[in-house]
């Protein structure tokens, strides 16, 4: 998102949401009412959490609706309802209100707060995905480096290049890796 050309207001909103996500608490502009009558108190601090597989399953089930068609009853899933169900489950708390929020509470948000919350959860998801990609990418890079080292070792020992070793079927490649490991101990 940083690479896009955002207008000054959009960039300011983006930067404030990023800073708040990093601090662990997102601030609502207008707040969410808690309580009734004179006892109503506005809640502003939102804590987000990662969705679980159970959250995703529950959101999908909640987004489905049974409708009648010419062929009989059919389950239809609403993408917008799925998004709302995921959003409400991703909210750990808003002030003293524990999540997941009910749809009735989501409806009480101002348009600005709803949009801010939607953007924040999207950015939060992107940050989580990026961190997972970096972790897994690092694992893949280490694995790839190990494979290339093993292929080079096999190529040196068998007097051919690493390309030959990498073109082998995996079972033969790993068998040669084991042989190269054993042989390299004797060639030191």
Curated annotation (Swiss-Prot):
Gene Ontology cellular-component annotations: host cell cytoplasm
Places the protein is found: Host cytoplasm
Alphabetical keyword list: Host cytoplasm, Late protein, Viral release from host cell, Viral tail assembly
Highest taxon of the lineage: Viruses
Alphabetical list of InterPro entries matching this protein: Tail_Gp41-like
GO biological process terms, semicolon-separated: viral tail assembly; viral translational frameshifting
The keyword Transport belongs to this UniProt entry's keyword annotation: no
Keyword Phosphoprotein: no
Induction record: Expressed in the late phase of the viral replicative cycle. Expression of late genes is activated by the viral late transcription activator C.
Known role: Required for tail assembly. Together with gp41, may act as a chaperone promoting the assembly of the tape measure protein (TMP) and the tail tube protein (TTP) into a functional tail shaft (Potential).
Protein family per UniProt: Belongs to the mulikevirus tail assembly protein family.
Official protein name in the record: Probable tail assembly protein FS-gp41
Biological source species: Escherichia phage Mu
